[in-house]
Curated annotation (Swiss-Prot):
Gene3D superfamilies reported in the protein's UniProt record: DNA helicase RuvA subunit, C-terminal domain (1.10.8.10), Vaccinia Virus protein VP39 (3.40.50.150)
NCBIfam families the record matches: hemK_fam, RF_mod_PrmC
Protein name: Release factor glutamine methyltransferase
Keyword flag Cytoplasm: no
Enzyme class per UniProt: transferase
Binding, substrate: 187-190
UniProt gene name: prmC
Length: 279
């Protein structure tokens, strides 16, 4: 009988040959998912039988199907968000922006009116809404397929979030709350067009990832909506490509309606977020 330990060894070798960046971790996460246990528990189950479906799941990963599609979830802080084909998979670095957002309003119950632009799976809004259950949140998404995933996550983790179908490049969007919002967050499409990225990237919806030759198309246009939404003194935080920090800061500076324009770094020290306040 093939043991789980032996199957993990073989799976790790298979995934390594396929170019997967973290073959052992992925193999263990697949096994833990199928066994219904935590990843750390795998070390105690090396002599167990191989769970049904393990070989097929490893083969899917070897074809560079995103691990999160195989597991059906993606971690976002304390949440395991539902994801699958048709929605952008949240990345760990976005938790930095989510944590920043919660800190901006956590101490003042009067300043908890928040908008998440380009919500995708609902990652930012769900994280914030789960942490601040009395917050008023609006989440905007253009893609109906992604919005379906977002609503599923809001229903489970942050039912107070109101999902809005709309285009964040339209400065008139959400006109009924213009000038009243305390905080805007966004993880918009920001990757420069390229055909040389990891295969998994291209399984996210193109419109959720890429934003023109320099990755700035959406950010350049959405700044006007952000300004319209925020009240004076309201804050904004945007995730961006690690090559465009200067360009994003320039967008807010040249607009003329923002001050306190600052950079946030991800956990590896890369400049990945710009924050600002409406004057």
């Amino acid at each position: 009988m093939l043991t789980l330990g032996e199957a993990l060894r073989d799976a790790t070798a298979t995934l390594e040959r396929a170019g997967v960046a973290s073959p052992l971790v992925d193999a263990r996460l697949i096994a833990a998912h199928l066994l219904g246990c935590g990843p750390l528990d795998i070390a105690l189950r090396m002599r167990d039988e191989v769970p049904a479906g393990f070989a097929a799941a490893v083969e899917r990963r070897a074809r560079r199907e995103p691990l999160q599609h195989i597991l059906g979830t993606a971690p976002m802080g304390p949440l395991d968000l539902h994801v699958g084909p048709g929605v952008f998979i949240p990345r760990p670095e976005t938790e930095v922006l989510a944590d920043w957002a919660v800190r901006q309003v956590a101490g003042d119950v009067e300043k908890r009116k928040i908008v998440d632009l380009c919500t995708g799976s609902g990652a930012l809004a769900a994280y914030i809404g789960h942490a601040l259950i009395d917050a008023t949140l609006y989440a905007v998404e253009l893609d109906p397929g992604a919005a379906t995933w977002a609503q599923r996550n809001f229903d489970e983790f942050a039912p107070q979030v109101k999902l809005i179908h709309g285009d964040v490049t339209d400065p008139t969007l959400l006109a009924e709350v213009h000038g009243t919002i305390d905080l805007v967050v966004s993880n918009p499409p920001y990757v420069p067009e390229s055909d040389d990225l990891d295969p998994e990237v291209y399984q996210d919806p193109h419109m959720a990832v890429f934003s023109g030759a320099d990755g700035m198309d959406v950010i350049n246009k959405m700044v006007h909506l952000i300004f319209n939404l925020l009240k004076s003194g309201g804050a904004v935080g945007i995730e961006h490509d690690d090559t465009t920090s200067d360009a994003v800061r320039q967008v807010f500076s040249q607009h003329g309606g923002f001050g306190t324009i600052e950079v946030l770094h991800d956990l590896t020290g890369r400049a990945r977020f710009v924050t600002a306040r409406k004057l």
